[in-house]
Swiss-Prot record:
Belongs to the AEP1 family. It comes from the Eukaryota. Required for translation of the mitochondrial OLI1 transcript encoding subunit 9 of mitochondrial ATP synthase. GO terms for cellular component: mitochondrion. It comes from Candida glabrata (strain ATCC 2001 / BCRC 20586 / JCM 3761 / NBRC 0622 / NRRL Y-65 / CBS 138). Residues 1-30 form a transit peptide. Pfam families: AEP1. The keyword Mitochondrion applies. This is ATPase expression protein 1, mitochondrial.
Amino acid sequence: MSTSGTTKGIPIPLNIFKRKSIPFGRISRVTPKPEQLLHPFYRPGNVSSLGLCMKEGKPALLDSKSIIPSIVQNSKTGNPVLANCSLAFSSVQGVSTWLKQYENLRETRTTPFSTIPFPDLNRYLTSLPKSKVEIIEKAYTNLINNDGSHISKGIILELVHELSSDFELAVFSENILIFFLNDKVSKRSELACVLEAAFDLLDTHIDQPKTIYKFLMAFFAKYFEVPVQTDTDLNTLMVKLLMKLENKFHLESMYSKMVPELTEALFSFYTREGNLHEANIAINDLIKKGFIPKSEDIENYLTLINTKYPGHNSQDYMWRLFHIAHFEGLIQSSDHPNLLKFLVQNCRHREEIETVFTIVAKNKNSKILLEHLTAPVIDSISNMKMHRVPKSSLLSDYYKMMKFAFNNELSHQLKLLLLQGYITFGNFSMSAKIIEDNHLNLTVDIANKLIKIIKHNNKLFKGIDCPGFSEEALALFLECYIKPFEDELNQHSKKWLIRQQHYCK
């Protein structure tokens, strides 16, 4: 099923829970297998699937555009690389089998999710018996009286050495770490001291993964209390600690024995610290185990993705979708407006955004989602590389869905957004219909806004004879809905309207 040409590929980890780098490579353009696709939400519609199976020559989905993130093999090295691929086939043979495999695979990824029962992390901070607290406090006071310091890695390690050597006291290294977190830490630099001490103690005193896991629960309880600052790099210290944990105990993954509550805390930590790679690994582990992170952490994660990959180029689109590749099951049942907004903003083809429309229409909270998605949908359609007539058709599909969801009772703001959308796409017939059918009361401010949109897109409106999109349709719209405000328009709008009326004559 290969086609000619080449496309660049990006090296990715062989295993998302490992961190081995792979050399950069180039790959032959091939149709990826269903299991190689990493697109988190696109599904071919019934019409597209039928057309794919019936088309002679070289059938394709998404107009053969290379917009599907996929893991494929480098034809020269055999190593896996991440690349934007197209769903184009060399012939119709085998297409129906490919589609069936693709659909079956997607069905297995839409399993139900559970909400994580988030515990009170503070109980890990206060878990030490009073008798142990008194022993550690006394030893600490004696130590700082001699040293003059308050908290440092050296003091923590010295206390561990002093107290753990007395077996009758039964004070362990993790007790001392938690003591400092609960009673002594109030800023990030002190959190760093405790992490550094834990890192060293992994070599000498900590002999079970669960000891570190318990410490980390207490650490995060304090971390979420401490004011956010950028003067101390906790991220690097955390990564080094967990890598050391993984290597010491020969774990397949540092997450393999973690409870979901701890993985969620790590996910939240990495999103706050700006570590997208580790946050991606953490959330993939949660989703793989059937758990949904907190809504605010998902939103922070999406913001982080956009911060790292803000561009409108194919590479940034690919990386943004890659980082939510495992969200498929979550997306199908999600009622988080910002997650659906993220999907809309990363649609580059009409069939992608039509898939999002289907997801929203099936959602029990579709009205809430539609209220949040209307402006992003119009922006996304506007940015697609296609003629304004099919753009307007897409907006009409969305409008029909809105009318059904709201039983034709749209808010003034939604009506106005739809009107501005149709004006942007130059469909003056539908613009008039929005006004008339929805009894939209225009004002001079709205008229000025519409003129500004028309002026910005004026070159696109010329030379189109399609009904509703022509210059005659524009002239009629201006005459009926804008001219009544002529005397009240701002200076720029009034001058433009006069010139336009003169031109139309």
